[in-house]
Every structure is written in C-alpha cells, then in structure tokens.
A protein has these predicted regions:
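Flexible phosphate-sensing "switch/lid" loops adjacent to ATP/NTP-binding sites
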Residues: 1-258
Length: 258
C-alpha cells in the first residue's frame, strides 16, 4: 500500500507562524483536490478542541483538519500537554487525560510515548494522500533533542520534506534561520527544502538583498510572507479560504540543493 507523502512546517521558535502556515497549506492542498490531513505529534496548549468521539486535541489541529475538509480526530494530535503550573502539565494521550506530570517526569518518560506517535502517524498515512505536519518550538534545542518527539524525529519517520519558518517581525531573522540550520545534523539539514521569512511588513523590495543573502548562504529557496492584520492567532480556530498564503517574493540560489 502506498503511504502518504509528508510535508512538515518547522520553526526557529514558538510563535513564528507554524500553525497558521500549516492551516493554510492544508487548505491549499485540499482545494487542489488532495486528500489531506494535519498532524502534530505533541502540542502544549490550554486551547483544546473536542472531536466527534469526545477526544481532546489541540485547537490548532482541529482548525487544520477543517481547513483540509476532514473531521478532527485524535490521531492528528496524539499527545497534548495542558499546563497547570510552571512545572506541571495534564497529559492527554489519544484524546484522553492520563494524569498530571511534573516536567522532569514527563521528559524522562517521553520516549515511552513514541510508539503512540508512530501509530497515529501511520494511521493517517494509510488513509490520506498528503500529511501536513506541524513541528513544535524549534528543532535545534540542543538540551532537549534526545527526547524531542515533535520535530526531526517525526520528519524522519514520515520521510517528510521540511519548510523552516522564521519570524522577521521579532528581529534577527538571519540568525534565526541560518543558526537553526547550522545546529542541525547533516541528515536533518538535508530534509530542509525551503526557508520562509514570515510576518514581513512594508515594501518587499527593501528586503530583496536579504532574500538573496539567505538563499546564497543556505543554498535553499526563500519565500517571504506578509504580516496580515486579518490573521490573528485565534484565526486558526476557524475555517477560512482566506488562509491561502500570499507570497510577497522569493528567490532561489543557482547553487541551492534540488
């Protein structure tokens, strides 16, 4: 049986726009006629949605499912952490609460949940043509990589091509993108197929040199997406055809990897 292809959106940090871009990609691919499903291995959020069967998943994954034209299911977000305090979270596995765990205890036992993640991903890959995967935080948190189930480990499991997103609005987008690439292993770096400069304001022509520099240094295509006042973080909780990304500009280096 042919398994679904996978595209993964990873970011240089939390809040760079992964959820909205993943939602937009689900919408675009659905409108192109593909059977699409979203996936996020592990989400940390108080904002939960309830599936038709009563399971809890991250609200973003529910919005992504609606954008893809399918009903949300627990396999789309097999692990949900709902913070209760700075060092304690309620653990929801496949839609069901399993208890509260201290941060150290969760990270220490995190690998025991990897089979749950694999099985959920495999379920979706058997049924759909394309899986659009959202990462969590950054793939380059060196002190957490041994237990990171949400980024490059998932990309390898799904054999996914990765889009790396940086947020120009918060500043330092060159360091964000190039620094993250530098901290990845060679095999991880090879999965990254494009860079996205997100939340750009103003005249895109003023960033043409920036796009060229990023493309030449990373040897990857670079895309620039505008900041939109119409899209708020809460926008991913609704289904909207307006979530089709509008590219302000892009560049490809003649030497970038294909």
């Amino acid at each position: 049986m042919t398994r679904a292809r996978a595209l993964m959106v990873q970011g240089t940090a939390s809040g760079v726009g992964k959820s909205v871009l993943t939602t937009a990609l689900c919408r675009v691919l659905h409108e192109e006629g593909f059977r699409v499903a979203p996936f996020k291995a592990q989400n940390m959020s108080l904002n939960a949605a309830v599936t038709a069967k009563g399971g809890e998943i991250g609200r973003a994954q529910a919005a992504q499912a609606y954008a893809a034209g399918v009903s949300p299911r627990v396999a789309m977000n097999p692990i949900l952490l709902k913070p209760e305090a700075d060092n304690r979270s309620q653990l929801v596995v496949l839609g069901r609460a399993t208890g509260a765990y201290a941060t150290e205890a969760y990270w220490g036992a995190g690998n025991t949940l990897w089979p749950v993640v694999r099985a959920a991903l495999a379920e979706l890959r058997r049924e759909f043509e394309i899986i659009v995967i959202e990462g969590a935080g950054s793939p380059a948190e060196l002190n957490l990589r041994h237990a990171d189930m949400a980024n490059m480990r998932v990309a390898a499991e799904a054999d996914a091509s990765v889009i790396l997103v940086g947020d120009i609005e918060r500043g330092g987008v060159f360091a964000q993108l190039l620094g993250t690439l530098d901290l990845l292993s060679p095999s991880e770096r090879a999965r990254v197929r494009a860079l996205v400069v997100n939340k750009f304001r103003g005249d895109a022509s003023l960033f043409e040199d920036g796009v060229r520099i990023l493309s030449e240094r990373a040897r990857l295509p670079v895309y620039v997406l505008p900041r939109s006042s119409r899209i708020r973080t809460s926008a991913i909780t609704t289904t909207s055809s307006r979530l089709r990304p509008r590219v302000l500009g892009f560049a490809t280096s003649a030497a970038h990897a294909t």
